[in-house]
Every structure is written in structure tokens, then in C-alpha cells.
Amino acid sequence: MVKKLLTILSIAATAGSLSIGTASAQDAKAGEAVFKQCMTCHRADKNMVGPALGGVVGRKAGTAAGFTYSPLNHNSGEAGLVWTADNIINYLNDPNAFLKKFLTDKGKADQAVGVTKMTFKLANEQQRKDVVAYLATLK
């Protein structure tokens, strides 16, 4: 009886840890739903209030063709900011703070002035991860 109970508890613990791991993984399907909030200003294939986001993962900041960026965003790209998954996840939490810290860390605090056009903040870390997984699917 005790052996059977231990087996059941072991299986339950394993299943629980699997579901916890799955919940924290990036989910492009969930990210697509989160992206609907972004569509107020963004599309994958054309510039609007914000730049086109197709191909953003891996792109140098401030370089979407035909989009006029704020000096803060442009300067970040000139200083070497590339939109890796981690950088986008951190940026979405607080765009202005992220860019200013990036420039300051690069020794360019004098260029860390003004604000980016991106006023939206996405506080939920899982949603940020999910939306980045979705952005990675856009070409």
C-alpha cells in the first residue's frame, strides 16, 4: 500500500513539475493574442504609429525601413542595440527606461535623452515572453 502511494505521489509530482515548466515556456499562440494589444500601433508588414514588426527579432534597433524613430530609439541602434528576444522582453517592460539604461551602459548617457514613441508597457513577464515568441514567427 505504501509503495503504491509513493508511486502515485511520484507521478503526481512529475506531472506537476512538467506543467509548471510548460506554463513558463514561451508560447507563440498565446503571444499572438497578446499582440492584438500591439496592433493599435503596429503591424507585421507596414509602418503605422510604430514600425513594422516583421523580422524585428535580430534586427538592429531603429532600422525599420521608412519609419522615423525618436532620437532615443535611433541613438540606441547607433550604439549597437539589436532586438534579441531578451532585449525585447526587457524593453517591453519599460521602453524608455530600457533604452536610457542601454545608452548609459554603453557610455552614451548624453544621448539617453527624450522619450521613445512607444508609451505602452507590458508588465506581465509571461506575456512579454509569449509576444516575443510570436514576433519571432513574423517575417
Curated annotation (Swiss-Prot):
Residues 1-25 form the signal peptide. The modification Pyrrolidone carboxylic acid is found at residue 26. Binds 1 heme c group covalently per subunit. SUPFAM superfamilies: Cytochrome c. Keywords: Electron transport, Heme, Iron, Metal-binding, Photosynthesis, Pyrrolidone carboxylic acid, Signal, Transport. GO terms for molecular function: electron transfer activity; heme binding; metal ion binding. Heme c binds at residues 38, 41-42, 118. GO terms for biological process: photosynthesis. Belongs to the cytochrome c family. Cytochrome c2 is found mainly in purple, non-sulfur, photosynthetic bacteria where it functions as the electron donor to the oxidized bacteriochlorophyll in the photophosphorylation pathway. However, it may also have a role in the respiratory chain and is found in some non-photosynthetic bacteria. This is Cytochrome c2. It comes from Rhodopseudomonas palustris (strain ATCC BAA-98 / CGA009). The gene is cycA.
